[in-house]
Design a protein with these regions (language model features):
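Internal, well-folded beta-alpha domain core
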Residues: 114-204
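Short, hydrophobic/amphipathic alpha-helical patches that form generic packing surfaces
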Residues: 27-38, 102-110, 170-174, 221-228
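Short coil/turn segments at secondary-structure boundaries
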Residues: 85-89, 186-187, 235-242
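Charged, alpha-helical interface segments at or near domain boundaries
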Residues: 46-140
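Long, compositionally biased intrinsically disordered terminal regions
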Residues: 180, 191-192, 211-291
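Acidic, Ser/Thr-rich peripheral helices and adjacent loops at domain boundaries
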Residues: 62-67, 198-211
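N-terminal amphipathic/basic-hydrophobic helices that include classical n-h-c signal peptides
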Residues: 1-13, 293
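N-terminal ordered "arm"
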Residues: 10-66
Length: 294
């Protein structure tokens, strides 16, 4: 016997109507809830930042946390993995991710738990691919994030395709629980802020790293020199390196920056700078070093 969703299902018609919501995960779940209440399948979902004109009427769906919770509870009852797929799916960079999620949820309510074993199903496969891409990017960034120290605070930047900060939060907050740090997502203009005992992910339109201190610039040079030194020159393989360390991450990684990145704020770049491996060895390290560098 087919399952029904959180609202008793009846006949549904695909409507030429667009659901617009506030862009939050809870707001999207309220769109799902309202589609069952109204017994209609929306043509498209748009967040409130969408300004393009449409030929179809637009219906604003307000966010009601009680409605969102009912959807989440219904997914959890079917299978915890179903809930995880929906939560992660909303963080992906998949085109029309709301439609992917909506089709999956409707199919899940209709078929039930057996859908989760049908990995090639049209309602499940696109979502699985998107979530795998998200998980892969999270895994890579756990090793590719580079922090710098600024007056006792650590700061780093990333440029991911997916919204990864909610999934990176536990990794960095648990390993750096005594540190105050900021990790900025350039793509989605949000930042993970942490200080001992508390954290938050907040919108941040712009963020620019300050010029490094002399000590921080020195640590950057040392990290770059370490990276260059450990390579076995006879086994140099640029193609393999790009496979394991995709080039789109390089612009936020210390070891791939140009010469100006390794100068303190009071230093000037010479007209003909020497490569780092030929540069003068930096002065001895200060007695206290930052917990995370590079």
């Amino acid at each position: 016997m087919p399952r029904s969703g959180p609202i008793l299902s009846g006949r549904y018609n695909t409507m030429e109507v667009i659901y617009r919501y506030d862009g939050s995960f809870e707001g999207f779940l309220c769109c799902v809830f309202d589609s069952y209440v109204n017994k209609e399948i929306p043509w498209e979902f748009q967040d409130e930042s969408h300004l393009a004109q449409s030929l179809f009427p637009v219906r604003w769906i307000g966010t009601d946390l009680r409605h969102a919770q009912r959807i989440l509870v219904s997914l959890e009852k079917i299978d915890p993995w179903a809930k995880e797929l929906v939560v992660k799916g909303f963080l992906t960079c998949a085109a029309n991710k709301e439609l992917l999620l909506y089709r999956f949820i409707r199919a899940l309510y209709r078929v039930g738990k057996p859908l989760l074993r049908q990995l090639s199903d049209d309602a499940l496969l696109p979502l699985l691919k998107a979530v795998r891409h998200l998980d892969g990017e999270v895994h890579l960034l756990k090793g590719f994030v580079r922090f710098s120290e600024f007056e006792g605070m650590l700061a780093g930047e990333i440029r991911p395709k997916n919204r990864v900060l909610p999934l990176l939060r536990h990794h960095f907050c648990s390993r750096m629980y005594n540190e105050t740090f900021l990790l900025y997502d350039r793509t989605h203009h949000e930042a993970l802020l942490h200080e001992p005992g508390k954290w938050a992910i907040l919108p941040l339109e712009e963020f620019k790293m300050a010029a490094p201190s002399a000590a921080e610039a020195q640590y950057r040079r040392l990290w770059k020199r370490f990276y260059d030194t450990i390579e076995i020159k006879e086994r140099h393989n640029p193609k393999l390196r790009r496979t394991h360390m995709p080039q789109r991450y390089w612009d936020t990684m210390t070891e791939f920056q140009d010469e100006s990145y390794f100068l303190a704020g009071t230093e000037a770049l010479p007209d003909n700078p020497l490569p780092l491996e030929q540069a003068h060895t930096p002065s001895p390290l200060p007695p206290s070093s930052p917990a995370v560098s590079g």
